[in-house]
């Protein structure tokens, strides 16, 4: 019976994607005992957003990605990665995709968008199930994640940063919720965009593993400031390291310290401040409501997010890292 329903929903999705997504969401609520409905919704949302992104006219950073994509036919894989000289995993993936999709740019964009939303959506479901969230809560979080404007606009503009963000959030979920430190996920995030390195560092702070108190929170912020100072003081030594060299160059560039028009028009700065307030409120609300339980599984990822937000909000002009902020409210929607 359920299989027939899912097949029907899938067919409707092919005819009318939005109606199919609506029916898929309804199936998740009606058939709570089945896990397949929620995974069907994950795929429908990801496929829908992938097709929309493929219709976008490449602008700004995407023009550069398009140029790099078509360069794959001119070089061998090693020369191609060395030519770009940064984020080897992303460019190795791009090289493979060029031949896998017969040099079709639209299919490449669809694949990267699909990959991004699948990782984000799967992370939401893992978090929701581990924390015993209701089916309604998980569905709402998935819908918010798919149709949140600032997230969507960046998936068609700063795709490397978005993929790094997705892998980073999945790393957080595995580390703090599933209790498995999957370094391979962190490496994938770094291989997509090195700007995620400070955020991975934040996730390793000892305060992240402890119950939230004002004292621990302030200690975490202070430690973060100290680490940032050490990072800049050791620039002459660390800038020779492959990954860190690019990160230092970005920190010192005008591109890092300026905002694009799309960021100003979409309210990136103001929304970042608002999200910071919301995340802080969520942390203390959850702590207050769950005093009788071991709330580390839920609170610790939010502590990490809050520290990341403080790091970003102190220097709102850092475009590369503000990109990573906007998926955090998805967890809060649960």
Report each predicted region and the residues it spans.
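Membrane-interface transmembrane helices that cradle and orient dolichyl/undecaprenyl
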Residues: 168-181
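Alpha-helical transmembrane segments and terminal signal-anchor/GPI-anchor hydrophobic tails
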Residues: 58, 63-66, 72-75, 91, ...
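Membrane-interface alpha helices of multi-pass inner-membrane proteins
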Residues: 181-204
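Short hydrophobic/aromatic helix or loop-helix immediately within or flanking a transmembrane segment
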Residues: 63-70, 80-103
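Transmembrane-helix motifs of polytopic, lipid-linked glycan transferases
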Residues: 111-131
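Multi-pass, polyprenyl lipid-linked donor-dependent membrane glycosyltransferases
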Residues: 153-169
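Transmembrane-helix signature of polytopic, membrane-embedded enzymes
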Residues: 124-147
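Extracytoplasmic loop-helix module adjacent to an early transmembrane segment
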Residues: 32-78
């Amino acid at each position: 019976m359920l299989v027939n329903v899912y097949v029907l929903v899938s067919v409707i999705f092919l005819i009318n994607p939005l109606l199919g997504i609506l029916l898929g969401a309804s199936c998740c609520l009606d058939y709570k005992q089945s896990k397949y409905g929620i995974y069907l919704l994950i795929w429908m949302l990801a496929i829908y957003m992938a097709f929309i992104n493929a219709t976008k006219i490449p602008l700004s950073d995407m023009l550069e990605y398009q140029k790099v994509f078509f360069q794959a036919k001119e070089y061998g894989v090693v020369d191609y990665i060395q030519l770009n000289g940064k984020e080897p995993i992303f460019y190795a993936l791009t090289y493979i995709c060029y031949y896998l999709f017969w040099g079709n740019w639209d299919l490449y964009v669809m694949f990267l968008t699909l990959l991004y939303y699948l990782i984000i959506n799967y992370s939401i479901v893992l978090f929701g199930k581990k924390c015993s969230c209701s089916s309604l809560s998980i569905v709402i979080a998935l819908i918010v994640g798919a149709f949140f404007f600032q997230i969507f606009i960046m998936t068609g503009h700063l795709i490397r940063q978005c993929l790094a963000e997705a892998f980073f959030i999945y790393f957080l979920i595995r580390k703090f919720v599933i209790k498995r430190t999957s370094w391979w996920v962190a490496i994938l995030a770094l291989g997509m965009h090195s700007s995620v390195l400070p955020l991975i560092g934040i996730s390793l702070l000892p305060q992240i593993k402890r119950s939230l108190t004002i004292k621990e929170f302030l200690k975490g912020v202070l430690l973060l400031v100290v680490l940032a100072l050490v990072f800049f003081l050791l620039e002459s030594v660390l800038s020779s390291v492959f990954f860190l060299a690019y990160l230092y160059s970005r920190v010192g560039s005008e591109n890092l310290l300026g905002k694009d028009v799309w960021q100003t028009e979409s309210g990136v700065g103001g929304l970042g401040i608002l999200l910071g307030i919301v995340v802080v409120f969520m942390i203390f609300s959850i702590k207050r409501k769950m005093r009788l339980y071991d709330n580390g599984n839920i609170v610790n990822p939010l502590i990490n997010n809050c520290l990341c937000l403080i790091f970003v909000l102190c220097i709102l002009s850092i475009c590369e890292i503000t990109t990573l902020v906007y998926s955090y409210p998805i967890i809060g929607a649960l």
